[in-house]
A protein has these predicted regions:
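Feature captures the catalytic cores and cofactor-binding loops of soluble hydro-lyases/lyases
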Residues: 1-171
Length: 171
């Protein structure tokens, strides 16, 4: 995961804890923001934007719109397996790996889960027991909607690996 430390508001550098708001698409997260469904302090998890789920990571613009909501910008966290632009700011955690589609921790976050972020100590914690985490991971299944895409994209999704290992096509 990557956090642009210089862009994080000072009050969010340590001791952040928020309730997860979970979105499986960028559009769903933007709709929630625009319709006032994000509350101060929420941890906005926007997943399935990584290499496997979106063929090369989706440009993530949620935090840019969050800037227009001062109270939210200074109290919320944004966590995604997608990528940020160089101009991103706020408590934004991107490129989370392994991505949700590969069974990474973002895939098992549930609405209302508590998430802690300590930027200084480089720690992100999903506040559930080890047993609950193991259970959720063992039950997690992600299915790529193959019928909606051309054959070469289906091959890419079937074979691409994690960003942490360079997104190598495993043949």
């Amino acid at each position: 995961a990557i956090i642009k430390i210089a862009a994080v508001p000072a009050n969010l550098m340590t001791g952040y804890r928020g309730k997860a708001r979970v979105f499986d698409t960028l559009d769903a997260s933007l709709e929630a923001l625009r319709s006032g469904k994000i509350n101060p302090g929420d941890a906005c998890v926007v997943r399935f934007l990584g290499m496997k789920a979106r063929f090369g990571t989706t440009a993530f613009t949620f935090q840019e719109e969050l800037k227009g909501h001062h109270e939210l910008f200074n109290s919320c966290a944004v966590i995604t397996d997608g990528r940020f632009s160089g101009g991103s700011s706020g408590l934004s955690v991107g490129y989370v790996s392994p991505e949700a589609a590969l069974g990474g921790p973002l895939g098992v976050v549930k609405e209302g889960d508590e998430i802690e972020i300590d930027v200084i100590n480089r720690r992100i914690t999903l506040c559930i027991s080890d047993e609950e985490m193991a259970k959720r991971i063992s039950e997690f299944r992600w299915e790529f909607p193959a019928s909606n895409y051309q054959r070469y994209l289906r091959l890419f999704v079937k074979n691409v690996g994690s960003m942490a290992q360079g997104c190598v096509w495993d043949c």
